[in-house]
Amino acid sequence: MVNLTIDGQRVTAPEGMTILEVARENGIHIPTLCHHPKLRPLGYCRLCLVDIEGAAKPMTACNTPVAEGMVIRTSTPVIEEMRKGIIEMLLSLHPEDCLTCEKAGNCQLQDCAYTYGVKHGELPVKREELPVLKENPFIVRDYNKCIVCGRCVRACQEVQVQRVVDLVGKGSAARVGATKAGAEVSLEEGGCVFCGNCVQVCPVGALTEKAGLGQGREWEFKKVRSICSYCGVGCNLTLYVKDGKVVKVRGYENPEVNNGWLCVKGRFGFDYIHNPDRITRPLIREGDREKGYFREASWEEALALVSQKLTQIKGSYGSEALGFLCSAKCTNEENYLLQKLARGVLGTNNVDHCARLXHSSTVAGLATTFGSGAMTNSIADIASADCIFVIGSNTTENHPVIALKVKEAVRRGARLIVADPRRIELVNFSYLWLRQKPGTDLALLNGLLHVIIKEELYDKEFIAQRTEGFEALKLAVEEYTPAKVSEVTGVPAGDIIEAARTYARGPSSTILYAMGITQHITGTANVMALANLAMACGQVGKEGNGVNPLRGQSNVQGACDMGGLPNVLPGYQPVTDPGVRHKFSETWGVPDLPGEPGLTLMEMMAAAQEGKLKGMYILGENPVLTDPDVSHVKEALKNLEFLVVQDIFLTETARMADVVLPGASFAEKEGTFTSTERRVQLLHKAIEPPGEARPDWLILNDLLLLMGYPRKYSSPGEIMQEIAGLTPSYAGITYERLEDKGLQWPVLSLEHPGTPVLHREKFSRGYGQFQVVHYRPPAEEPDEEYPFLFTTGRNLYHYHTVISRKSRGLEEMCPAPVVEINDNDAARLGIREGEMIEIVSRRGKVRVKALVTDRIPRGQVFMNFHFHEAAANLLTIAALDPVAKIPIIKPVL
């Protein structure tokens, strides 16, 4: 600690803090323009000049560290005149269009001019007038207003680490520009990912959101805090609302999640909520599914028909003839009500959702080894790790804000190991790139364990005190020598050895993975192998380590938590446990609940095709595009006697329904999402749903009442009270407690602070359980007829199958599907860039444009699954992981 005096006030501060930081901490104001608390201080603007006793000249407070005995004066006549002169210089170079500027009311230059009484600039300096750049769908750049503070440059280079923009020119001609190889280019040509974080930190009107142009002044907006509706990171947002419309979005400063940073979808992809294609009234099909049509109906008629048909099917065929799909895009409260309808009113455990296709192997694998099938650590932890092992996750495109934490850790000195067949962006930041063949992850992971055990790098004390089954694992991995694993995976033996040593030595090592690990015939075994690796090295139960599945959708974790699975009630309480069933049935006021696990999503589709499943209720899911072997899915849905779809758009699945119920988007309702890090967070209603659309919880509550269930909920908060009373991990959650930063479950009581790190003292199951798992080849392998390996995944500008395609800007950036093919393979086959080619598998074929690249290895092709025009899942296989029943979405052609 150091002692110093600021403006006569004696203060004590930690060594290394800057004068500006210490002053602000003690309530002393020093003006700044270039400074931003989340960016490296550079002292560009000079507004923060202060007088330091004994110094030869004034010093910039933003980047001058405090020292013992310093005596600082932040405001003297000389300093004040210098600040006025700086502001006058900036105004002399600045357009005087404050009356019409989008930044008016939120402009820091305007604030400084007001504070110091500088009305306009009169210095004889001029700047060449520059064109206003509007070449992309998201950001308007007016560099005439640029004050060369460098904030946007630092956000791009230090936070996003894209290095697209930089300072160009000198003196009064200095400004910011996008550059590539020394030449000025458009943002897109420069490699911009349009996160818009530069817009968020810009202190003036040089960078603005195109969507907000002319839509309102700062003081006219109602600002509503919410949570992003895209991926599972749970980024906090501020919605800017005027005249019942969301005009723009800014990142909300929650330091435990996104710290204000966003990606292109979170910041600019919100406009789908106002798309004219929204369903605004209930629809009822007239005629059959082949030649029939939809007509609009009242809510009374639509819900009465749904109630009648579901009751009729139960009466005629039994409860097991019904199936329900929960939604990873709807709130916890809504998922809770749907599974309650299925189990408590209609008597079936045939309840599942899209987690079956993505992370059901995570739930099965981590529940077996650790006792809890969720991310062990916090997103914020990632930045403090010493080693980060990313496997099966294209993090920069699928979870861009988590990728910022990875980049932050690397900048701090962490070693990044990336295991991926494709040259994903994180490879550019990696210490090691393990380019394994698709489907060989288990061999690779067992190979890492072989090295760790052989070289005795494992944590003997942790294993002895907190785990069981290690000796069996030790014997099992003996055969996975680096040489043998290299032969199977294609990864050099030396890289396998170095990766094992780096991970084991940490000191803090974290694992991040996604669907590249889970969507395999050995998906559950892959997850267990990751758990084995972490337990062997004692890398569980502390900050900066753990095993961290990155969940794909905004509330996929919550849908699982709420019992959107066929074998568990909310809180992962087994349906087979009589005590659990009694607790729920007593609270719900219904007879005993069904005690046998229900059908999974894929089993429901098979049962529908066989004529055993007669009716389905699908909430906010689109299996016609997202499920594997979609031809099979379409046939299954056609075979149903009755199909209800509740959604905000007429999706490919909704088009096959008998009744379509229009729900509400995230901005149009209250409720909670649970993010990938187990953080339960509040949604706040910002606008009304369009037309007669209703919040989904209200639709489900009305249907429950119509079907004879007597409980009428007054609000989602009341539903959460019921959830908390039945679910131990949510027991201490109330809406009031979630208002600040949310809470990470388990939250065991109203006094419990939440759990950022799982398994600190012991595992949820008691002892961690090592599992012996062995590599086996993929469900299909290349042959002469189908020689290519085919994999699927996401694109940065899209999310799943519908909502991002209803966002004008996102669709403009990526309007059509492409298939990535290696440049050597393309040359051999005579395929040119942009040429339409046909991709054929044993199950179907699609026509799509070729993207020729060295990003993907020879013998492999990659395609996004977002597009109905070329549905990737026409090609995929419905083979299942034997444990989690997850389908294999990594087939061959």
Swiss-Prot record:
Any one biological process term the GO annotation gives: formate metabolic process
CDD domains the record matches: fer2, MopB_CT_Formate-Dh_H, MopB_Formate-Dh-H
Domain 4Fe-4S Mo/W bis-MGD-type: 221-277
Obligatory cofactor(s): [2Fe-2S] cluster; [4Fe-4S] cluster; W-bis(molybdopterin guanine dinucleotide)
Molecular function GO terms recorded: 2 iron, 2 sulfur cluster binding; 4 iron, 4 sulfur cluster binding; formate dehydrogenase (NAD+) activity; formate dehydrogenase (NADP+) activity; metal ion binding; molybdopterin cofactor binding; NADH dehydrogenase activity
GO cellular component: cytoplasm; membrane
Top-rank taxon, per record: Bacteria
Cofactor note as given: Binds 1 [2Fe-2S] cluster.
Location(s), subcellular: Cytoplasm
Occurrences of domain 2Fe-2S ferredoxin-type (ranges): 1-78
4Fe-4S His(Cys)3-ligated-type domain span: 78-117
Catalyzed reaction equations: formate + NADP(+) = CO2 + NADPH
Binding positions for [4Fe-4S] cluster 3 per the UniProt entry: 228, 231, 235, 263
Similarity comment: family membership: In the C-terminal section; belongs to the prokaryotic molybdopterin-containing oxidoreductase family.
Record's subunit section: Heterotetramer composed of two alpha (FdhA) and two beta (FdhB) subunits.
Function of the molecule: Component of a dehydrogenase that catalyzes the NADP-dependent reduction of CO(2) to formate, the first step in the synthesis of the methyl group of acetate during synthesis of acetate from CO(2). In vitro, can use methyl viologen and benzyl viologen in addition to its natural electron acceptor.
Additional note from the record: The active enzyme contains per mol 2 mol of tungsten, 2 mol of selenium, 36 mol of iron, and perhaps as many as 50 mol of inorganic sulfur, but no molybdenum.
Protein name: NADP(+)-dependent formate dehydrogenase subunit alpha
Native organism taxonomy: Bacteria, Bacillati, Bacillota, Clostridia, Moorellales
Recorded name of the encoding gene: fdhA
